[in-house]
UniProtKB/Swiss-Prot annotation:
Gene: rpsP
One GO CC annotation: cytoplasm
The name this protein goes by in its record: Small ribosomal subunit protein bS16
UniProt organism field: Aquifex aeolicus (strain VF5)
Keyword Ribosomal protein listed: yes
InterPro entries referenced in this protein's UniProt entry, alphabetically: Ribosomal_bS16, Ribosomal_bS16_dom_sf
């Protein structure tokens, strides 16, 4: 089961609001979600609320991020503060994953 952090639309007519949620990759946009990480208002371009500890928890579990969810969390500084030292963002197809960075010493040791 592939799990992703992505946006789920709700709100009213002509005023969409998106929840930043963790859900199965095959679920529809407004389908069942596993966890709510925050809320985003695109009209005002503000994060209404975000739970950085939940974002960090899911990122460390290896969850993929959709392009839009990654952009929103990165531009508002959430990903910068929750991603620990030694992790880097890698693009896997259309999605992003944080993985442990290999140290240069271990690479050099294998080559010698």
């Amino acid at each position: 089961m592939a799990v992703r952090i992505r946006l789920a639309k709700f709100g009213r007519k002509h005023h969409p609001i998106y929840r930043i949620v963790v859900m199965d990759a095959k679920s529809p946009r407004e389908g069942k979600y596993i966890d709510i990480l925050g809320t985003y208002d695109p009209k005002r371009k503000v994060l209404i609320n975000v739970y950085p500890e939940k974002v960090k928890e899911w990122v460390l579990k290896g969850v993929e991020l959709s392009h839009r969810a990654k952009a929103i969390l990165w531009n508002h500084g959430i990903l910068k503060e929750v991603v620990p030292e030694g992790y880097e963002m890698k693009r896997v197809g259309d999605y992003y994953v944080f993985e442990k960075r290999e140290s240069k010493k271990s690479k050099g040791g294998e080559a010698a």
